[in-house]
Amino acid sequence: MENLKMYEGKAKVLYGTGDPNVLLMQFKDDITAGDGAKKDTMTNKSSLNCTISKKIFEHLHTLNVDTHYISSPEVNEQFVRAVKIIPIEVVIRNFAAGSICRRYGINKGVGFSTPLLELFLKNDDLHDPLIGEDVIVEMNWATRNELREMKERAHIVH
């Protein structure tokens, strides 16, 4: 199982390590835009992303937020725990920007009185649509308890 490619996405490749609970995550120099429609490479992107990711996960550890991160043996690699992937992206907004402006006709930069939490289905083919909790549960992408925990952690990290 060691060094067997388990998954490849737009930004990372996951390899088996011989331990079924641990994967090697290798960052890629590939860059994409438009849900993967535009592709190119950027020298050292993998090492920059790995370094930033490492610092974020180490900081989260100091806040007692559990993550999949174990260690970073190389400039573009991390050992991570094997986890169940929930295909949901959690976005917290303090100010209007991006898709929320287009969806609701809000001017960019408008501040919100309280952080807004939105959930999106991670699916490039569908352009990562906004999704409701009932749909997430009905489609078995996450349970109500998992959603509650995701939202709680998102607010802590925010």
Region roles according to the model:
Residues E2-F120:
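Active-site loop/lid in soluble adenylation, ligation, and acyl-transfer enzymes
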Residues F79-R81, C101-H158:
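ATP-dependent phospho-/nucleotidyl transfer catalytic cores
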